[in-house]
Amino acid sequence: MAIESDLDGASMDELAGKSYEALLYLMNKNKKRKPEKKDDKEKSSKKVQKKNKVIESLNEMEVEMEDENENENDEQEAIQYYINVESQDADETLHQEAQDSSEDPFHQHFDYDDSEVIKNSIAAYDEGKLCKSIEESKLGVSQSFFPDVTKRLPCSCLSEIKNIDDLGLKQRILDSYKKQKPSGQLTSMQIELAKAMFNYQDVFFTNMSMKSHKLGTSLLALHALNHVFKTRDRVLKNSARISQNPELEFRDQGYTRPKVLILLPTRNSAFEFINLLISYSGTNQVENRKRFDNEFSIEKEVISEKKPEDFRYLFSGNTDDMFRLGVKFTRKTVKLFSQFYNSDIIVASPLGLRLAIGNKGDKKRDLDYLSSIEIAMVDQAHALVMQNWEHIECIFDELNGLPKEAHGCDFSRVRPWYLDQQARYMRQTILFSQYNNLDINSFFSHYMSNIAGKVKFRSLLHGVLNRLGYKVTQTFVRISVDSIIKVPDARFSYFTGSILVQLKKYSQSGILVYIPSYFDFVRVRNYMDEEGINYSAISEYSSVSDMTRARNLFYQGRTNIMLYTERAHHFRRFDFRGVKAVVMYGPPTNPQFYVELVRMPMRTISEGNLDSDAAKCRIMYTKFDSICLEGIVGYQRVSNMCHGKHEVFEFL
């Protein structure tokens, strides 16, 4: 969050280094901004989204009024509970807590108070000075990154993990988990993942299968709950002690209550994740459960069994991508739809939270509830890329900033690294994705800056060329370009000057042109309009009727070329009839898309409209497409294809 300080002309860096001045500024400022002009309208074709927005707006006003009354009662009841517990055997309790703190990553990470080590580690991150290591792991390959400093935060106290008992979970969570899985066994994948996750390092797990994703989200739910329960227990215990002895001082808080942010692609994914949280929480009392079921589930599954398995996994249930809700935990209950400032966990879609945040310059902008997020989880990033990745970046730009208002904060209990605006370097970020791409990889580099280190887990990809099921000539053509900025022009020049010229010359029909970027799609479409080329087009913005018409014209041969965007395929997964050859303007982000596209001529062959040896596929790529290309051709080929002396590679 940008800060415009009036404190004696102090710069941003000076303000960040002076906690006392920062507090004065925070409590006394009255800043006004001129609104920026920015068109950020979000259009939705689903009526359910509009209905949910109206319902949520009305319900949020009602919940906010209820929360204000209930929150104070819950707090006082919990404090009294801990006063009673402390009074039973104070010495034993303090001794046990001290012992637990020395062994618990939660306390080692968030209670760390060596300001010099924190400062040096942050400087190393900002200057790009990182120690890197690569190791084989149960997940394939793990790449670790740490600040290149003499002394850094401890992060290895959970190095030996054999089962659920070794994760340092709160007893109520552990008991709830073992009721469902009495053995408490973890898979080798979960053990490897937990070593980094429960040590509060940043985690990026890519190339996740559907099975590994289910196992991974189970760990996410356990970790989120564990963090919330330990945070609340620490705060309430210390509040109880202060009520008995006001001279005691504790640094155990952030500015606001929410500590965990979870970003998910659909209401169904939120429905399943929140049910996991509830099942592990150790309570059967869930407020607003009926409303939650009504708004986040559906009565009957309508997805076609003919769709690919990964499509059915992602788009099952309620697929609405506009939602947000708070989740609050007390000793006895779980409250859904709690007001954000009284919540422990915020669960949202990027679109839903982005609309709540608003735009820079908005007069009534309220995002202070994001100031004290200590764990940020981005699940199924591959699906979020297909929505609007800019929402993710906007949200993370706003995380861990100085709040505009106090919100009842006791500043004497705020941790020093919050006051010094260092919270984003202490925050743990966890990122799960089915595959990697440039946007996701850039996010890992720029937004995951945990000074305890970060770990990237990825499989050794062997490619999908042997999964096609029939012989088809696949020609990969590397386009020479020395800068990523020049890539769009280079692709366009090659396509219009080489491929399109041949298509026009021979008047070949049944050509599917797959274009990953919508902006490239618009450019190619406009060019073909200018040249008077006969074509059909389907993008993510096409209406159902336009899609049906385009598919019919293409199949009947009344148009020779079909332009087709990656996002349209992600949301529709069409299997076109009449395809005789495939041209890929760039490698598909999802390797599974490559398999589906190259298989499309098989249908034409089976219908007797194409010879079995006549199917062709041509893929344009540059050296900057190495991440996507690796998933298609495999890690052993990608280096030579991107940097070798040859520019054309053919596979059969």
From Swiss-Prot:
It is found in: Nucleus, Nucleolus. SUPFAM superfamilies: P-loop containing nucleoside triphosphate hydrolases. Residues 59-74 have a biased composition (Acidic residues). Residues 29-74 are annotated as: Disordered. GO terms for biological process: maturation of SSU-rRNA from tricistronic rRNA transcript (SSU-rRNA, 5.8S rRNA, LSU-rRNA). Keywords: Nucleus, Ribonucleoprotein, Ribosome biogenesis, rRNA processing. One of its GO terms (cellular component) is nucleus. The keyword Acetylation does not apply. Residues 36-45 have a biased composition (Basic and acidic residues). One of its GO terms (molecular function) is U3 snoRNA binding. Its main location: nucleus. Component of the ribosomal small subunit (SSU) processome composed of at least 40 protein subunits and snoRNA U3. DEAD-box RNA helicase-like protein required for pre-18S rRNA processing, specifically at sites A0, A1, and A2. PANTHER family: ORF PROTEIN-RELATED, U3 SMALL NUCLEOLAR RNA-ASSOCIATED PROTEIN 25 HOMOLOG. Belongs to the UTP25 family. This is U3 small nucleolar RNA-associated protein 25.
